[in-house]
C-alpha cells in the first residue's frame, strides 16, 4: 500500500494542474476530470484504510480514554453529515473509561455512527448508548434505517463486503469501515 501513495499523489497533482491550466474545459472534459477526481479520491481512501489496517498491531494502546466525551466529540464531528439528511443524533452514555488507543477507539465509534447516518432514512435518528455490563463497556449504535438483513450480519464485517452494491457509488467508501471496526474491537479485547 505504501508503494501506491506516491503514484496516487502524483496523479492527483497532475489532475489538479490540468484543471487549473484548462479552466474553460468543454462539458465532456469537465465531466471526465470530475469522474477521475472522484475515482482517485476513492482509491486514495482505500489505500489509506489498507495502511491503517496493516498497522493496527503496532499502534500503542496505553491511552486512558474517557468514553462519554469521546462519543460526544464524534457526534459533534458528524453533526454536519447528519443535518444534511435531517438525522437526529442522540446519546445516553455512562461515564466509563478504558485503556487503549484513543485514535483507534475514535475510529471505531466514528465508523459505526457514520454508517448509522449514511444508511438511515430521511428524518431518522442515530442513538449511541454506553453501559457497563459486568466488567465490560458495552457500546450500542442504533439507527432508524432499514436494518441489515439477517443473512448479512456476519458478512458485513468482512473486507469489501457491501449489502447493497448498487448504492456503493452513492454512499462512498469501499466496504472496509466495518472490517476495521471489528479489527479494532478485537485488538482491544472486545467483539462486535
Q: Could you tell me what each predicted segment is?
A:
Residues 148-162:
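Short conserved segment of the HATPase_c
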Residues 35-43:
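Short alpha-helical segment of the dimerization/phosphotransfer core of two-component systems
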Residues 116-117:
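Short helix-loop "hinge" at the ATP-lid/N-box region of the Bergerat-fold HATPase_c
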Residues 81-90, 96:
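Short conserved segments within the C-terminal catalytic ATPase subdomain
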Residues 143:
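Acidic ATP/Mg2+-coordinating residue in the GHKL
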Residues 189-190:
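Conserved glycine-rich
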Residues 123-135:
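Short beta-strand/loop element within the Bergerat-fold HATPase_c
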Amino acid at each position: 500500500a505504501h508503494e501506491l501513495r506516491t503514484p496516487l499523489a502524483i496523479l492527483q497533482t497532475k489532475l489538479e494542474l490540468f484543471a487549473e491550466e484548462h479552466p474553460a474545459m468543454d462539458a465532456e472534459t469537465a465531466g471526465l476530470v470530475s469522474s477521475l477526481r472522484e475515482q482517485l479520491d476513492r482509491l486514495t481512501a482505500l489505500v489509506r484504510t489498507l495502511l491503517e489496517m496493516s498497522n493496527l498491531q503496532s499502534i500503542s494502546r496505553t491511552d486512558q480514554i474517557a468514553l462519554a466525551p469521546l462519543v460526544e466529540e464524534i457526534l459533534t464531528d458528524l453533526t454536519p453529515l447528519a443535518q444534511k439528511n435531517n438525522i437526529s443524533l442522540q446519546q445516553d452514555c455512562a461515564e466509563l473509561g478504558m485503556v487503549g488507543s484513543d485514535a483507534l477507539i475514535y475510529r471505531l465509534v466514528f465508523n459505526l455512527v457514520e454508517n448509522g447516518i449514511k444508511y438511515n432514512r430521511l428524518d431518522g435518528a442515530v442513538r449511541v448508548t454506553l453501559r457497563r455490563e459486568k466488567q465490560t463497556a458495552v457500546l450500542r449504535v442504533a439507527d432508524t434505517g432499514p436494518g441489515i438483513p439477517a443473512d448479512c450480519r456476519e458478512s458485513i464485517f468482512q473486507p469489501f463486503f457491501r449489502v447493497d452494491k448498487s448504492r456503493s457509488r452513492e454512499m462512498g467508501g469501499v466496504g472496509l469501515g466495518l472490517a476495521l471496526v471489528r479489527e479494532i474491537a478485537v485488538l482491544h479485547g472486545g467483539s462486535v
